[in-house]
Every structure is written in structure tokens, then in C-alpha cells.
Design a protein with these regions (language model features):
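Short, motif-level signal for alpha-helix interfacial/capping segments enriched in acidic residues
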Residues: 2-12, 50-53, 76-91
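Residue-level signature of transmembrane alpha-helical entry/exit and packing/kink sites
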Residues: 13-18, 54-65, 80, 84
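Juxtamembrane helix-loop-helix connectors linking adjacent transmembrane helices
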Residues: 1-25, 43-50, 119, 124-126
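Active-site alpha-helix of zinc metalloproteases
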Residues: 21, 25-26, 34-35, 69, ...
Length: 126
């Protein structure tokens, strides 16, 4: 799923690219999508919980944020984008129920696992 990075990784760029994918991207994506966008749509009070402990407005905010988040990942195929949408809903739930830091940590872990799988399948000759 990370084939779009083929050709970007050289011995000189490996550490910087891993840092960008595992740390920088999740940090700014969570700040934008779960901090700003999701936060802007959340109601001031969290009463009237319904599905999974979320109110209808929190669900709507999660869907909007997740759709926008998925749209910035168009480099993936449809299955990859469906997975990203699902992960985004999980990150949104984590943000609403437990705060932005947990959403960031989950995103870091996801990107680290994806990067590790990508690097393990690469030819050993960088």
C-alpha cells in the first residue's frame, strides 16, 4: 500500500523519510483533522449520548473529519482508502472520548507499522 514511496528511499533519505511518515505526518494530520476540523464540529456539551457513547453530532463530526482525512490519501487503492476511513473513525472516537494525544499515539503506531512492513518487503540493496 505504500508503493507510492518506491524510488523515494535512498540510504541518505531513509531516516528522514521514516521520521516524516511516522512522526511528522501523524502529528500534523491529527492536529488538522481531529484537532481543528473535528473540534470545530463538536457540540459544546456532550449530552444525549447514543451510539457507542457518541451523540449524533459527534458521529456527524467524526464522519465529516474522516471523509476529509480519507480524501487526502488518494494515492491508495479503494481498499486502502476504506481501511484509512475506518482508522480515521477510530482516531476520531479516541479523540472524542480520550483526547487528542491518544489519537496521535494511535496514528503514530499505525504509520510505524505500515512503514515497518514496507521496509521489510523492500529489496535489501538500498
Amino acid at each position: 500500500p505504500m508503493d507510492f514511496m518506491n524510488g523515494m528511499i535512498t540510504p541518505d533519505s531513509l531516516v528522514l523519510l521514516v521520521f516524516a511518515v511516522v512522526v511528522v505526518a501523524p502529528l500534523y494530520e491529527e492536529l488538522i483533522f481531529r484537532g481543528v476540523i473535528l473540534g470545530a464540529w463538536l457540540p459544546p456539551d456532550r449530552t444525549n449520548k447514543k451510539l457507542l457513547g457518541l451523540s449524533p453530532n459527534e458521529l456527524k463530526a467524526s464522519l465529516i473529519s474522516s471523509i476529509l482525512f480519507t480524501l487526502i490519501h488518494l494515492q491508495y487503492d479503494m481498499l486502502g482508502m476504506a481501511v484509512i476511513f475506518g482508522l480515521s473513525l477510530i482516531f476520531s472516537y479516541a479523540r472524542i472520548r480520550h483526547g487528542l494525544l491518544l489519537a496521535m499515539i494511535l496514528h503514530f503506531i499505525n504509520n510505524a507499522c505500515a512503514m515497518l512492513m514496507y521496509l521489510l518487503q523492500m529489496p535489501t540493496a538500498l
